[in-house]
From Swiss-Prot:
GO molecular function list: RNA binding
Gene: smpB
Function of the molecule: Required for rescue of stalled ribosomes mediated by trans-translation. Binds to transfer-messenger RNA (tmRNA), required for stable association of tmRNA with ribosomes. tmRNA and SmpB together mimic tRNA shape, replacing the anticodon stem-loop with SmpB. tmRNA is encoded by the ssrA gene; the 2 termini fold to resemble tRNA(Ala) and it encodes a 'tag peptide', a short internal open reading frame. During trans-translation Ala-aminoacylated tmRNA acts like a tRNA, entering the A-site of stalled ribosomes, displacing the stalled mRNA.
An annotated GO cellular component: cytosol
Name by which UniProt lists this protein: SsrA-binding protein
UniProt keyword rRNA processing present: no
Keywords: Cytoplasm, RNA-binding
NCBIfam families: PRK05422.1, smpB
One GO term (biological process): trans-translation
Organism classification: Bacteria, Pseudomonadati, Pseudomonadota, Alphaproteobacteria, Rhodobacterales
């Protein structure tokens, strides 16, 4: 019997707070320029994108404050854990991202980092608008109600 690869098994890191803190308007897949020791560290699962963001600087897209743990078997100089990493998108997508962030209140948020089918590290980024506290409460209330509804349906059936 053939093994089916689970898409979540290729997941490296996920920004779980992104959908809670932001309204994600559009998602874009971007490549990321990494060093060899960074890729090896990602294969071991040492990454965190929860506090990171992306920005367009001098006509290029950069991931800022993304954490990749040091690879222990690397040579002594290894890599810097929180360095700026260049994101690879097409010129059309870059122009769209730049115009989106030029609008007030819009930002580029990393959503998920994963290996694609060819084993290349990809980053799913989203054009997002920050939620206010009342929006967060509304999202939380909807989620709680849907859980309660599912629990009641399960009890009654």
């Amino acid at each position: 019997m053939a093994k089916h690869s689970d898409p979540n098994s290729k997941l490296i890191a996920e920004n779980r707070r992104a959908r809670f803190d932001y309204f994600i308007e559009e998602e874009i897949e971007a490549g990321i320029m990494l060093l060899g020791s960074e890729v090896k560290s990602l294969r071991q699962g040492g990454s965190n994108i929860g506090e990171s963001y992306a920005s367009v600087e001098e006509g290029e897209l950069w991931l800022i404050n993304g954490y990749i743990a040091p690879y222990l078997q690397a040579k002594t100089w290894g890599h810097e854990e929180r360095r700026k990493r260049k994101l690879l998108v097409s010129r059309r997508e870059l122009a769209r991202l730049w115009t989106a962030t030029a609008r007030e209140g819009m930002t580029i948020v990393p959503i998920r980092m994963y290996f694609n089918d060819r084993g290349i590290v990809k980053l799913k980024i989203g054009i997002a608008k920050g939620k206010k506290l009342s929006d967060k409460r509304e999202t939380s209330a909807k989620r709680d109600w849907s859980r309660e509804k599912q629990r009641l349906l399960k009890q009654n059936s």
